[in-house]
Amino acid sequence: MQTVLKDAEDRMKKALAALDKEFSRLRTGRATTSLLDGVRVDYYGTATQLDQLASVATPDSRTITIQPWDRKAFADIEKAILKSGLGLTPVNDGKIIRISIPPLTEDRRKDLVKVAKKYVEEAKVAMRNVRRDANELLKKKKNDKAISEDDQRKGQDDVQKLTDNYIVKTDEAFSKKEKEIMEI
């Protein structure tokens, strides 16, 4: 029974980690290097992650700088950022690419909160699926006479407590992200 709980907890942790990763990609008006995590650059015919072609830094809260290691990559990096759909405009001065992060409009902030809410719902669904799988496994063990009915009921209660705990953590992460997005 403990293995079922441990497995369920590991899977819920992964769902929460995936939510945090999605949240880190949401633009909040502050410059972070994680904004560019999903950007792939077509470099000599291969889709390459930006951080493998250049050093990415945030000198202040409104600017991201990209310093490519290969001068030939400047145009490819600019093109990839423009195509990424992030709404960012790179400025190339020949040595470094600068991206200024404009302040978000009220409408854009509300849209980002909706996107964050969608990510939260996806994480909650994933956690509920983990709960369902764990409960089915406990039921199967009871039917196979590996555990008693009392143990099954206790296991299901423990899985429910675990699920409730992780859903609270998910809601807390959303509240924090919502506050960050709506902050001017």
Swiss-Prot record:
InterPro entries: Ribosome_recyc_fac (IPR002661), Ribosome_recyc_fac_dom (IPR023584), RRF_sf (IPR036191). CDD domains: RRF (cd00520). Keywords: Cytoplasm, Protein biosynthesis. GO terms for cellular component: cytosol. Its main location: cytoplasm. Residues 141-161 are annotated as: Disordered. One of its GO terms (molecular function) is ribosomal large subunit binding. The keyword Transmembrane helix does not apply. It is found in: Cytoplasm. One of its GO terms (biological process) is cytoplasmic translational termination. PANTHER family: MITOCHONDRIAL RIBOSOME RECYCLING FACTOR PSEUDO 1, RIBOSOME RECYCLING FACTOR. Responsible for the release of ribosomes from messenger RNA at the termination of protein biosynthesis. May increase the efficiency of translation by recycling ribosomes from one round of translation to another. Belongs to the RRF family. This is Ribosome-recycling factor.
